[in-house]
Design a protein with these regions (language model features):
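Short acidic-aromatic low-complexity motifs
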Residues: 2-28
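A beta-strand edge to alpha-helix "cap/lid" segment located at domain peripheries
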Residues: 55-135
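Alpha-helix C-capping/helix-to-loop hinge sites
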Residues: 12-16, 36, 87
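C-terminal ligand-sensing/allosteric alpha-helical core of TetR-family HTH transcriptional regulators
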Residues: 8-9, 50-53, 81
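Short amphipathic alpha-helical segments
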Residues: 1, 5, 46-49
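A solvent-exposed, acidic/Ser-Thr-rich amphipathic alpha-helical stretch
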Residues: 22-77
Length: 135
């Protein structure tokens, strides 16, 4: 079951990134889900929290964005997804970062989602400071 939920998550993320279909990904989360990442100390709770996280905190951060998955590991009630995300900031600046997302799954729903990545690097790219510091 966990492998199928992970696959549906990847498909829904693709639709969110490519077509801004927010409801597809929100529908995968449990009513009492917890959603977050290393950038935000705030945890987003429930489906409304998932909607805010995946809309305002994720998709709206980018102009264009696309994630690819290198490894997907799923076991009973858990999945780990290794990914790379590329796209542009809203001002057109290129963005690339990679990380790992952990999904805790109950039945056919995601109970908890947390993503781990280099938040400093992503922040510099989104604010256009990466080239100044890297160069």
């Amino acid at each position: 079951m966990s492998e199928q939920v992970a696959k549906r998550f990847i498909e829904a993320l693709d639709k969110l990134e490519g077509g801004r279909d927010l409801e597809g990904i929100v529908g995968l989360f449990a009513a009492d889900a917890e959603v977050g990442n290393v950038v935000s100390p705030e945890k987003f709770r429930g489906r409304e929290g998932a909607r805010e996280f995946w809309g305002a905190k994720y998709r709206d951060t980018f102009g264009e964005v696309r994630s690819t998955f290198r490894n997907v590991f799923a076991a009973e009630g858990r999945a780990a997804l290794e990914w790379a995300t590329e796209g542009t900031a809203n001002d057109g600046t290129p963005v690339r970062y990679d990380g790992v997302s952990i999904l805790e799954i109950e039945g056919e729903e995601i109970k908890r989602f947390h993503a781990y990545f280099d938040a400093g690097s992503l922040g510099r790219q989104l604010t256009g400071k990466a080239q100044a510091q890297d160069g």
